[in-house]
Structures are given as C-alpha cells and as structure tokens.
C-alpha cells in the first residue's frame, strides 16, 4: 500500500531541493533532469525496490541502474534520505575525492549499482544483471532468486545504438524481470530530439 500522497510529495520535494542545492553549491552540474526525476526515485525506493539498508550487498536485493550519470543528484539525495549518504556528503558533490562525484561510481555499500559511462551503457548493464538473475533463478529456484532489475534511461540514451541492441536482446530473451523507466520529454542537451533523430520509440520497443 502506497504511503500517504502528501508524505510522498513532501519527500520528493526534499529530493528536488537537495538536488538543486548540490548543483548550486558545486557551481557545476545538471539540475533539470535530477529535479524532474525526483518523484520517480522517491516512489521507486519507497514503494517498489526490495532492499535492506542494513545489508546493501544482500544477494536477493532488487537492483537500480541509473543510465544518465549527470542526473546523479537525484540518486544521491534519494539515498541520503535512506541513510546511505550524509548531508555533508551531499555538500561535497563534484568535489575532488568526495563520495558524491558528478557521475556515480560503483559503491554497493552506498546503494550505487553501476558506474555511469556513455549514454546507453547503464541500459546494457541492467540487461546483463537481468540475465544473471534469470540464470541464478533457474539453478537456485525462485524462492532464493526472484529479484527485479530497474533501469532509468533518457531520450539521449534511447538515441544511442547500444540501447537499441539492448532492447532487441531483452525482447528476444524475454527478460520480464527488467523494468525500464524511460524519461521521455523529447529534449536532449541542446535541442529537441527530433532535430537529430525522428523515430517512434514506443513502436520500436514493442517490436
């Protein structure tokens, strides 16, 4: 049962404010996407993702893969509300040697499942994790292994060929444990997506 909507909105607003504050203090970063994704990250971690904050490396946990690494402020802020990062950690966003770099780096103890790379790579890593889960489930049984893999990708990532290949593989293998959230707003870094690519993304993934 979902938490009270007022509580959920308040939590998401806190993530938004923290994300914007991190970028403002660092005088560097991308606030827009992180603020826009705050509701998603809050709902995912509070209502759907199965994990144990006391045992971040628990084998049976669900996994979340963030593809657009520049949206890291929303992830750090969301994880901070769950005890994985301190407010001091958030203040050190994008600073040399900090645990909150501009683009996330693998740190399972802090809830970071993947190092970000070129757009689309996180999508591929998520599909690989979904394949691994199916492999283990077939051998150990669904009682022990039945976790889900969540991925967050953006318009820019969908334009990359690596994502197209991942979509074909996921469909061919029937990876029903892979749940991809597509942040579709028809915008990329400097233009609308249609300026460089005109495609029916929904139909492409259905195919």
Predicted regions located by residue number:
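Conserved thiamine diphosphate
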Residues: 138-145, 186, 193-207
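Cofactor-binding active-site loop characterized by glycine-rich and histidine/acidic residues
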Residues: 36-173
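N-terminal capping segment at the start of a domain
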Residues: 12-28, 183-184
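Hydrophobic (often cysteine-bearing) scaffold residues that line and stabilize catalytic clefts
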Residues: 11, 15, 33-37, 71
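Short internal beta-strands
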Residues: 65-67, 177-184
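Short, solvent-exposed loop/turn segments at the edges of secondary structure
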Residues: 173-176, 207
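Generic start-of-chain signal for non-secretory N-termini
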Residues: 1-17
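Hydrophobic alpha-helical scaffolding
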Residues: 5, 9, 30, 65-68, ...
């Amino acid at each position: 049962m979902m938490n009270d909507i007022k509580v959920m909105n308040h939590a998401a607003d806190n993530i938004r404010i923290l994300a914007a504050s991190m970028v403002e203090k660092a005088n560097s970063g991308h606030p827009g996407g992180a603020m826009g994704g705050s509701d998603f990250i809050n709902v995912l971690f509070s209502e759907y993702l199965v994990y144990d904050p006391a045992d971040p490396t628990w084998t049976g946990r669900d996994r979340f893969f963030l593809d657009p690494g520049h949206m890291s402020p929303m992830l750090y802020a969301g994880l901070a509300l769950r005890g994985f990062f301190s407010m001091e950690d958030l203040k050190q966003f994008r600073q040399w040697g900090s645990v909150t770099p501009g683009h996330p780096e693998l740190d399972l103890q802090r809830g970071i499942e993947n190092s970000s790379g070129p757009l689309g790579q996180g999508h591929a890593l998520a599909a690989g994790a979904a394949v691994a889960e199916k492999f283990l489930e077939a051998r150990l049984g669904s009682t022990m292994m039945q976790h889900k893999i969540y991925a967050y990708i953006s318009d820019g990532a969908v334009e990359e060929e690596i994502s197209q290949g991942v979509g074909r593989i996921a469909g061919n293998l029937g990876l029903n444990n892979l749940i991809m959230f597509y942040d579709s707003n028809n915008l990329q870094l400097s233009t609308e997506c249609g300026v460089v690519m005109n495609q029916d993304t929904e139909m492409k993934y259905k195919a």
